[in-house]
């Protein structure tokens, strides 16, 4: 299998929610690696990942439930733990998830 190289100039951002965009890096059937970009004040609503999730905060500050997060932080959520992200400033995060996201109803 060949190495995959995604140029930043070729990254395709798509709207996820109001003020929240995502860019798939390596996604298959809703699982894999992607970027999430938040405008200050934007929210990713309550959801969980049946297989857990790894988050690296590239830039900005926000809250993941009651946890204050900022650039350089790494968070690993256990499988099935519901959480929401509120951006206090513009935020960029890198997410890796082994299973698709499930949004609360």
Language-model region placement:
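Glycine- and acidic-residue-biased ligand/ion/polar-headgroup-sensing regions
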Residues: 40, 49-64
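Short glycine/proline-enriched turns and hinge-like loops at secondary-structure junctions
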Residues: 48-50, 68-69, 87-89
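Short acidic-glycine-tyrosine-enriched beta hairpin
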Residues: 64-84
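Cytosolic regulatory regions built on CNB/CRP/Popeye-like sensor folds
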Residues: 1-2, 65, 104-105
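Conserved short histidine dyad/triad with adjacent acidic residue
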Residues: 19-21, 26-49, 76-79
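Ligand-binding loop in jelly-roll beta-barrel domains
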Residues: 79-104
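A short, N-terminal "cap"/entry segment at the start of jelly-roll beta-barrel domains
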Residues: 1-30
